[in-house]
Regions:
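Aromatic (often tryptophan-rich) hydrophobic motifs at membrane interfaces
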Residues: 109-114, 132, 143, 154-166, ...
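Short loop/turn motifs at secondary-structure junctions
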Residues: 106, 171-173, 328
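Active-site/acyl-donor-binding loops of N-acyltransferases
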Residues: 16-19, 26, 34-61, 109, ...
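A conserved beta-strand-loop-helix scaffold within acyl/acetyltransferase catalytic domains
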Residues: 64-117, 125-133, 179-192, 198-309
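Conserved acyl-donor/pantetheine-binding loop and adjacent beta-alpha core of acyl/acetyltransferases
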Residues: 127-145
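Short catalytic-loop micro-motif centered on adjacent basic/acidic residues
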Residues: 176, 231, 331-335
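Acyl-donor-binding surface of acyltransferase catalytic domains
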Residues: 2, 6-12, 16-55, 139, ...
Length: 407
């Protein structure tokens, strides 16, 4: 037993050493000039809360009230977000408090309001210190999509100009904008990611009949294997996090803090839930479901690989979809995937279809493609080392790293 303990300890230290060596090879540049990609043919917005200018494409003069919110958004913010065709969970006002309280990131929530009573534009973002890769202003960190959304194109351009100004004023090395539609920026977006959406019928029986025979058989297999599903909230957080932390280690990814999910469940309240799949009394799968507008989202889900043969994820998702039908939810968002990946195939088997995500990244590098390539190689090496660490180590140090990774 003593020899085995020495072997495990040595393996742990080797993995930690490998992780540290790669991380320390990247020293952040002390002084970065931020060369933000400009908007096409749109003048910059001055650095004060309100500015009067002529809106491009409008005959009459209008007053643009472009301001950054100093406190959490009110109900009007969510009303504007949900009324937009680009409505998404990432626009929810709740993230202002969740991300700030859990990780200490500074929120930059911008609104652009016309004087004619038209729809406003909203643009949420956070300043994230991403050691060792510099500081970024991201809309939205940890989520599939952010802003800007709502209003007219001139208003969206005004909000974008303000957020670019905020990033430049704070010495950000990079700005990330994750959107559901293209922006008026002189930089091409990454089109690698899609989010997968499924329209829901009004009752679970209709949904069941629409599912492929293979999917229904896998759900039945989970039931025959003794898998059961329970839905709750904060009372199930510990069980969810236990599974989630193991799965994130196995994937080579630092885990979010439990406080992040606690803040999420507390702030969203009754529209957020935890779904747990159990084999006997032991949790073997879990997911977080959040309803925003007419859509139910699953931003985080995990199962233990050792139990995947019992298909706990199938019964867990079926129960979540079934409840969404009973609650009168119009559509279900399975979250982002890379086309052709395993998670993409898992989601499409439920009848989900792709919706393109437009992810823009602007930075001061003279060779952004090379910089991204170097960044990707670094994360790949770190991921390999991370998988070798014991779960208790990844749970202890993972949240400190995860809060600085915006994806």
């Amino acid at each position: 037993m003593r020899e085995r303990h020495k072997s495990v300890t040595a393996s742990t230290f080797d993995a930690i050493r490998a992780f540290a060596q790669v991380a320390n090879s990247f020293v952040p540049t002390a002084q970065r000039c931020v060369s933000m990609v400009p908007l096409r043919d749109v003048p910059a917005v001055p650095d004060h809360p309100s500015t009067e200018r002529t809106c491009p494409g409008h005959d009459a003069r209008c007053v643009l009230d472009v301001r950054r919110l100093e406190s959490a958004p009110e109900a009007a913010w969510d009303a504007a977000a949900c009324a937009s065709p680009q409505a998404h969970l990432g626009m929810a006002s709740a993230w202002f408090a969740i991300i700030r309280n859990a990780y200490g990131h500074r929120p930059f929530y911008v609104t652009a309001q016309p004087n004619d009573g038209g729809d406003p534009v909203i643009l949420p973002a956070f300043l994230v210190h991403r050691w060792p890769f510099g500081t970024t202003l991201t809309s939205m960190p940890f989520l599939d999509a952010g802003g800007p959304t709502g209003g007219t194109r001139p208003l969206r351009d005004a909000a974008l100009a303000r957020i670019l100004l905020e990033a430049q004023a704070r010495g950000a090395a990079q700005i990330e904008l994750r959107c559901l539609s293209p922006l008026n920026l002189a930089v091409p977006p990454s089109l690698e990611k899609v989010t997968l959406i499924r329209s829901l019928p009004s009752d679970p029986d209709s949904l069941w009949r629409e599912l492929d025979t293979k999917v229904r058989n896998q759900i039945r297999k989970a039931e025959r294997s003794g898998i059961s599903v329970e839905t709750g909230r904060l009372d199930l957080l510990d069980e969810f996090y236990r599974v989630f932390a193991v799965n994130m280690r196995d994937l080579g990814s630092p885990v979010h803090s439990k406080e992040f999910f606690r803040q999420l469940l507390h702030t969203f309240g009754s529209v957020a839930s935890v779904v747990i799949a159990r084999k006997g009394a032991a949790p073997v799968g879990g997911l977080i479901a959040i309803t925003y507008g007419e859509t139910r989202y699953v931003p985080w889900a995990s199962t233990l690989r050792s139990h995947n043969a019992s298909c706990p994820n199938m019964l867990m998702y079926w129960e979540t979809l079934r409840r969404a039908c009973l609650d009168g939810i119009a559509q279900f968002d399975f979250g982002r995937s890379t086309r052709g990946s395993g998670t993409h195939r898992f989601k499409t088997q439920w009848g989900a279809t792709d919706r393109q995500l437009y992810w823009y990244t602007a930075n001061c590098s003279q060779d952004p493609a090379a910089r991204r390539s170097s960044h990707d190689r670094t994360l790949a090496v770190l991921s390999g080392a991370w998988k070798r660490l014991p779960v208790f180590v990844t749970r202890a140090i993972g949240p400190t790293i995860r809060k600085r990774l915006t994806q």
